[in-house]
């Protein structure tokens, strides 16, 4: 597993031509750096823009794979998924790496104040770059716990998207009542958390029905770095984008 993106980059900002993504490096805490992969859609009116910060599963690192001889970076979402989401919401998708002092993030770390500090630094940077945009966090698998912790700790967020999340992520409170939360889970694994609805009208649950499609070798190789919805990943991305824009989502994806 690649815990961080292996690129030779300047401390402040660089352009990764081969990956066709903008790379930003931030100092999140004294002496600690984190890498951001920035995917931006064509410009729209400022009031229509959204920034989505993606927090990966597994240990939280980036996976670098080769397709047709060109490197691709899976930072929670695949490059195609990041671009599709950015284009649909008319904004920016930012994949966040683990911090340099914690290349593999476990549950204890994801609940820590230092992790919140790292996420807050990324949110603050994004808000400074796109001040008229709404900021969201999207977490995948273990990253969903990070996203939920972010909404419990960082006030300057519009809400969170939790993909393939465990009940512990759903149980996290939100810092502000205005925040919205979308949880997308497998139908056969989406147990009901006592606080899954919690009487919160701004929390939306979507079930993905599992038709037991056998994953390809490429999908299996990236299982820890991207959401696994058995061939319905594109539908999930579209549902997420629609929910960010409108607040509406279907009860299920088949």
Please annotate each region the language model reported.
Residues 158-213:
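The feature captures the conserved acid-bearing segment of alpha/beta-hydrolase catalytic domains
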Residues 1-8:
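Bacterial N-terminal signal peptides
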Residues 44-84, 88:
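Short, surface-exposed "cap/lid" segments of acyl-processing enzymes
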Residues 82-103:
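Conserved alpha/beta-hydrolase
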Residues 121-178:
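Primarily recognizes the serine-hydrolase "nucleophile elbow" in alpha/beta-hydrolase
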Residues 202-254:
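C-terminal catalytic histidine-bearing segment of alpha/beta-hydrolase fold enzymes
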Residues 14-47:
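N-terminal cap/lid segment of alpha/beta-hydrolase-fold proteins
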Residues 77, 105-130:
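Alpha/beta-hydrolase active-site loop
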């Amino acid at each position: 597993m690649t815990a961080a993106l292996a690129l030779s980059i300047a401390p402040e900002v660089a352009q990764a031509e081969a990956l066709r993504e903008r790379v930003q490096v931030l100092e999140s805490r004294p002496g600690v750096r984190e890498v951001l992969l920035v995917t931006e859609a064509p410009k729209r009116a400022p009031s229509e823009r959204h920034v989505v910060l993606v927090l990966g599963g597994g240990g939280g690192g980036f996976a670098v794979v080769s397709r047709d001889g060109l490197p691709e970076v899976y930072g929670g979402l695949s490059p195609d998924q990041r671009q599709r989401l950015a284009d649909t919401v008319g904004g920016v998708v930012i994949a966040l790496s683990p911090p340099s002092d914690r290349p593999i993030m476990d549950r204890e770390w994801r609940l820590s104040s230092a992790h919140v500090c790292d996420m807050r630094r990324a949110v603050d940077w994004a808000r400074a770059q796109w001040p008229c945009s709404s900021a969201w966090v999207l977490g995948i698998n273990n990253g969903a716990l990070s996203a939920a912790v972010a909404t419990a700790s960082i006030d300057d967020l519009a809400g969170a998207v939790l993909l393939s999340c465990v009940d512990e992520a759903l149980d996290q409170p939100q810092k502000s009542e205005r925040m919205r939360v979308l949880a997308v889970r497998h139908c056969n694994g989406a147990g009901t958390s006592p606080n899954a609805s919690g009487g919160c009208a701004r929390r939306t649950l979507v079930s993905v029905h599992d038709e037991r499609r056998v994953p390809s070798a490429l999908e299996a190789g990236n299982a820890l770095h991207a959401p696994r919805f058995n061939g319905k990943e594109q539908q999930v991305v579209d549902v997420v984008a629609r929910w960010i824009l409108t607040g509406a989502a279907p009860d299920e994806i088949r």
